[in-house]
Amino acid sequence: MAGIPEVVAMDCEMVGLGPQRVSGLARCSIVNIHGAVLYDKYIRPEGEITDYRTQVSGVTPQHMVRATPFGEARLEILQLLKGKLVVGHDLKHDFNALKEDMSKYTIYDTSTDRLLWHEAKLQYYSRVSLRLLCKRLLHKNIQVLPGSLLGVGGCILPGTDILHLLLYVGMVRIADLRLLTPFLPPSCLACPLLPESLASARSHAVISALSSSSHLLTPLPNPSQGPQGHVDRLSGQLQDWGGSPLAPALPVSAEQLAGPLLCGRCQGHNGALQNLSATQSPARAALPWDVRLNFILIQG
């Protein structure tokens, strides 16, 4: 699968620094797609620690005795992330703590993926935590004890759960991409306003990389919504789809879709796009649940 970046998941813990208790990096863990730990160190931040946030971070003064200095840890972490696709939840906080420009990296952030929110029936929330997403979608409790980042006390490593979440939504995304891409004009595919679940080559790269690790299919739960067998139907083809040219997964034509399938958010963007109404077409109503879900996201 040439050209597919290596996928890693990163999770950081913070402490409060100075009188304003500004967040500083106190621990960073990185795992690869197979769940192997690539990095896990306590880090001594620059500045005086005024709040260890132990109840949330699990960090204590004892951890700082032999902690790696921030400057040294930062170089180690950034070297590990170089050239990789970084998966995480609310990654802007992690990169801020690393004093690094996040735009230099290829990332996938579960905190901004609205498709995940819809899957978990959390679409009306203004903010969604990783704990809640994992509870709703994976039926797992994470971060239940201080210091549970790497499974202390039987807890699950958040980075691994992020990858499982990514695979869960990725199965829907692959179906969407294969079905919908042939009907989207290049101008729409290139539009930065188009939901990432449809157009992003970055998303497809993540899914393709994940699809090469078949063991990650095992813990995937059946969704409570949608027709029975949805997961089985997709997971059986996931390996074959990885890195393959996109093609319609179902025999659906543009005519059956009652007009061009265009991004409603782009209306007026290039003068050629229209709003999509998923409720006014019998053909659309007959489409699989995973594709109808994406219609909702386009309109949203």
UniProtKB/Swiss-Prot annotation:
Binding site for Mn(2+) 2: 90, 93
GO CC list: Cajal body; cytoplasm; nucleolus; nucleus; P-body
Induction: Induced by interferons alpha and beta. Weaker induction was seen with interferon gamma. Increased expression was seen at the transcriptional level.
E.C. numbers: 3.1.13.1
Consequences of knocking out this gene: ISG20-deletion mice exhibit higher mortality following vesicular stomatitis virus challenge. They also show a slightly earlier onset of symptoms when infected with venezuelan equine encephalitis virus. However, weight loss and the median survival times for infected mice are essentially equivalent between the deletion mutant and the WT.
Any one Pfam family match given in the protein's UniProt record, by short name: RNase_T
List of residues binding Mn(2+) 1: 11, 13
Gene3D superfamilies to which the protein is assigned, alphabetical: Ribonuclease H-like superfamily/Ribonuclease H
Location within or outside the cell: Nucleus; Nucleus, Nucleolus; Cytoplasm; Nucleus, Cajal body
SMART domains: EXOIII
Domain of life, per lineage: Eukaryota
Cofactor(s) needed: Mn(2+)
Protein's UniProt keywords contain Nucleus: yes
Cofactor binding mode and count: Binds 2 manganese ions per subunit.
Family: Belongs to the exonuclease superfamily.
PANTHER family cross-referenced by the UniProt entry: INTERFERON-STIMULATED GENE 20 KDA PROTEIN, RNA EXONUCLEASE REXO1 / RECO3 FAMILY MEMBER-RELATED
Purpose of the protein: Interferon-induced antiviral exoribonuclease that acts mainly on single-stranded RNA. Inhibition of several viruses does not involve the degradation of viral RNAs, but rather the inhibition of translation of viral proteins. Exerts a translational control over a large panel of non-self RNA substrates while sparing endogenous transcripts. This activity correlates with the protein's ability to localize in cytoplasmic processing bodies. May also act as master regulator of over hundred interferon stimulated genes leading to viral genome translation inhibition.
Designated name of the protein: Interferon-stimulated gene 20 kDa protein
Species, as recorded: Mus musculus
